[in-house]
Amino acid sequence: MLHGHHMKKRLSKNKSDIYFVYPGNINAKTGGYIYEKNILEYAKIRDINIRPIALSENYPFPTNKDIKYFLKILDKIDPHSKIIIDGLALEGMYSIFKKILTYNVIALIHHPLYLEFKGQRSKKFLRLEKENFKKINKFIVTSKNTKNLLINEFKVLKNKII
């Protein structure tokens, strides 16, 4: 996994690389991380090289330092590479969304983040998700419910969900 000072040496400009960006500790015993570990295991079995990149646990509420760190990562990745970004991280990156969309982004959505909150915070995430999900080219979803929610509530085209 890529952390801090090791990142500079290990990222390449190879456009065939696939990067997997997620917040926090992938070894935590939660459903989300178990799903993400399954993606990495599946890729390994299929001999697909996915390069995991762990971000801060602060997402979806990253600090300025967290955002700067991620921007440094992006600068070291070929823009034609595929970057799978976990929704928890992606939905905390709206301040740099235009930059992110210059890359080949695949959003991994467990469920829209607005569902985790109430009141103004929920409304804010719902607005941002509706605005930004339509700009993403591909999605990976973790359930039929999430797939249906993206199609029906966010108007994501079925062919964008892989």
Residue ranges and their predicted role:
Residues 87-89, 111, 143-145:
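Helix N-cap/beta->alpha junction signal
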Residues 1-56, 79-81:
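N-terminal subdomain of nucleotide-sugar transferases
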Residues 134-160:
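A short, active-site helix/loop in glycosyltransferases that binds the activated sugar's phosphate group
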Residues 97-103, 133-135, 156:
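Short, conserved loop/helix-junction motifs that constitute active-site signature segments
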